[in-house]
From Swiss-Prot:
Keywords: Cytoplasm, Magnesium, Metal-binding, Pantothenate biosynthesis, Transferase. Catalyzes the reversible reaction in which hydroxymethyl group from 5,10-methylenetetrahydrofolate is transferred onto alpha-ketoisovalerate to form ketopantoate. This is 3-methyl-2-oxobutanoate hydroxymethyltransferase 1. It comes from Burkholderia ambifaria (strain ATCC BAA-244 / DSM 16087 / CCUG 44356 / LMG 19182 / AMMD). The lineage of its organism: Bacteria, Pseudomonadati, Pseudomonadota, Betaproteobacteria, Burkholderiales. It is found in: Cytoplasm. Mg(2+) binds at residues 53, 92, 122.
Length: 271
C-alpha cells in the first residue's frame, strides 16, 4: 500500500498562507497524526496539517498535553510527511522543549528533519527572543496565544483568555510581540470574538482561530473532535462535522467548505 497520490493542487507554503490572508481566502487547518489521514485530509482540501501535542489527549489518553515528548511529535510528524501532502505541515514544540532559544532551535531542527515545514510554540511577549532566534535561523514559526494548553496548571484549568480589559490588552501585546519577532502565523485559542477580531485586524500575518470567532484568517480543530470520536465533554468551539455525512472524507470536505465560506464557527461556537 502506498499513501502517495497524484495531485494538481499547488503546494501550500508559508508565503501562500500570507497570500491567502491578503486575498481574504480563509485557511482550513486540522490536526493530523498519521499517513492515512494526511492523505485523506490533503485530498479533501485541507490547507494545513498540524501535528499537535493534542495527540497526548486523543491518541495517548492523557488529560493534558504535558506528557507529550519531542520524540512523540517527531514520530508522528514523520508519519504525516511520508504521505507527501500538498498541505503545509506544522509541528508543535511540546512542553519543556523550548525553555531557551538554543533549546528551541535544537528541538525545531529535529522536527523539521522529520518533515515539519513550520513549528508552533505557545506563548506571547516572553517568547519574542526565542521566535526571533528561530526565524533568523530559517525556522518558520507559528505562535499560539490566548488559551495555551501547556499552561493549564498556571491558568487553573482550560479557561477563556482575554475576557477582562487587562486580559485583552495583554493578548494584544502578545500578538503584536510575536509578529514583531518574526512569527508568520498565530493561533488564537479560546478568545472572545471581539478581541480576536481586533487582533486579526491589527496584525499583518494570518490568524488561525479555535474558539475565537469567524473574523480570524482561518480555523483549526482537533481532528478527533470534528469527527465526533473523542469521548468526554465537547468544548464549546467544536462542531461534529461527521453528523449527516456518509464518509470521513465527506465530513472533512464539509469542514473545509464551512471554514472557507465563514459559516463555521457560528455564534454557538464562539465566546
Amino acid at each position: 500500500m502506498t499513501y502517495l497520490q497524484e495531485s494538481s493542487r499547488p503546494a501550500v507554503t508559508v508565503p501562500k498562507l500570507q497570500a491567502m490572508r491578503d486575498a481574504g481566502e480563509k485557511i482550513a487547518m486540522l490536526t493530523c497524526y498519521d499517513a492515512s489521514f494526511a492523505a485523506l485530509l490533503d485530498r479533501s482540501g485541507v490547507d494545513v496539517l498540524l501535528i499537535g501535542d493534542s495527540l497526548g489527549n486523543v491518541l495517548q489518553g492523557h488529560t493534558t498535553t504535558l506528557p507529550v515528548s519531542l520524540d512523540d511529535i517527531a514520530y508522528h510528524t514523520a508519519c504525516v510527511a511520508r504521505a507527501q501532502p500538498r498541505a503545509l505541515i506544522i509541528a508543535d514544540l511540546p512542553f519543556g522543549t523550548y525553555g531557551t532559544p538554543a533549546e528551541a532551535f535544537a528541538s525545531a531542527v529535529k522536527l523539521m528533519r522529520a518533515g515539519a515545514q513550520m513549528i508552533k510554540l505557545e506563548g506571547g511577549e516572553w517568547l519574542a527572543e526565542t521566535i526571533r532566534f528561530l526565524v533568523e535561523r530559517a525556522v518558520p514559526v507559528c505562535a499560539h496565544v490566548g488559551l495555551t494548553p501547556q499552561s493549564v496548571h498556571a491558568f487553573g484549568g482550560f479557561k477563556v483568555q482575554g475576557k477582562t480589559e487587562a486580559g485583552a490588552a495583554q493578548l494584544l501585546r502578545d500578538a503584536r510581540a510575536v509578529e514583531d519577532a518574526g512569527a508568520q502565523l498565530v493561533v488564537l485559542e479560546a478568545v472572545p470574538t471581539l478581541v480576536a477580531s481586533e487582533v486579526t485586524h491589527m496584525l499583518k500575518i494570518p490568524t488561525i482561530g479555535i474558539g475565537a470567532g469567524t473574523d480570524c484568517s482561518g480555523q483549526v480543530l482537533v481532528l478527533h473532535d470534528m469527527l465526533g470520536i473523542f469521548p468526554g465533554k465537547r468544548p464549546r468551539f467544536v462542531k461534529d462535522f461527521m453528523q449527516g455525512q456518509p464518509t470521513i472524507q465527506a465530513a472533512v470536505e464539509a469542514y473545509v467548505r464551512a471554514v472557507k465560506d465563514s459559516s463555521f464557527p457560528g455564534p454557538e461556537h464562539s465566546f
